Regions:
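Cell-envelope and extracellular/periplasmic
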Residues: 1-239
Length: 239
């Protein structure tokens, strides 16, 4: 459910992180070959999640589209008629997946107070010395982030056009929450179906182009040299 389900201390291989693997295996080996220092991967993932709702970054505001109000960070439900002054809450809130993946429970939005504690990235780092005693004296550095997500956002006509700004906010939030203001940040684009982005539906293009935009120093000079976008469309393969 988007939290740390297995913790391994050893060479990256099948079985070291439980009975499931993902793109961290290919990525991790490349990082290990490139760097002389030991590399620790902390993976938090969950499918079918949007930045517009599930990963809505802390501080993200409420907004209105048509006659609907959309939740700000920590609010529930995801949307309601603006004329409704007392919308009925649901068992989820804007940004809950962000909280569960990245923040200590004490830093969760107030709406998260009734949810069970989880083991997440914040816990791994807080217990680094215990989990990785061989490296306790050396400590750790947040050397970078990788973000690969976006498919769910493109299925929503409100979230898709807001994706780029939400991604900017997410990059800034993660750097702030992990005290790594200049850590490199790699964004992998959505790539379902492969082919050319110009042949995709309009909302797909909005998300994809937003992902590519944040890595363009002409559009985001504040990210120049620290944010890189990678187009994954050419790597799609049909099994």
């Amino acid at each position: 459910r988007g939290v740390i389900s297995a913790i391994g201390d050893g060479p990256l291989q099948v079985g070291i992180t439980g009975n499931r693997v993902g793109p961290e295996h290919g990525f991790g080996h490349i990082m290990g070959w490139y760097h002389e220092e030991p590399v620790l991967l902390i993976k938090a993932s969950q499918g079918n999640r949007s930045i517009g709702w599930d990963f809505y970054p802390p501080g993200s505001p409420q907004y209105v589209v048509g006659d609907m109000t959309y939740a700000g960070y920590g609010e529930t439900p995801n949307k309601w008629l603006t004329t409704d002054t007392n919308p009925t809450p649901v068992t989820w809130y804007a940004g809950k997946q962000y909280d569960e993946c990245f923040l200590d429970e004490s830093d969760w939005a107030p709406a998260g107070a009734g949810f069970d504690a989880v083991t997440n990235a914040a816990d791994v780092l807080a217990n680094f010395d215990t989990l990785y005693p061989d490296w306790a004296a050396q400590g750790y550095e947040i050397a970078g982030f990788v973000w690969w997500q976006g498919h769910k956002d493109h299925t929503d006509g409100v979230y898709a056009p807001r994706y780029e700004q939400n991604l900017v906010n997410l990059i800034q939030s993660l750097r702030t929450d992990f005290n790594a203001p200049n850590a490199p940040f790699v964004v992998a684009s959505i790539g379902f179906g492969g082919g050319a982005v110009g042949d995709k539906p309009a909302n797909y293009q909005l998300v994809h182009n937003g992902q590519m935009a944040v890595g363009d120093p002409a559009q985001y000079p504040g990210f120049a040299g620290t944010v890189k976008s990678v187009n994954t469309l050419p790597y799609w393969r049909t099994l």
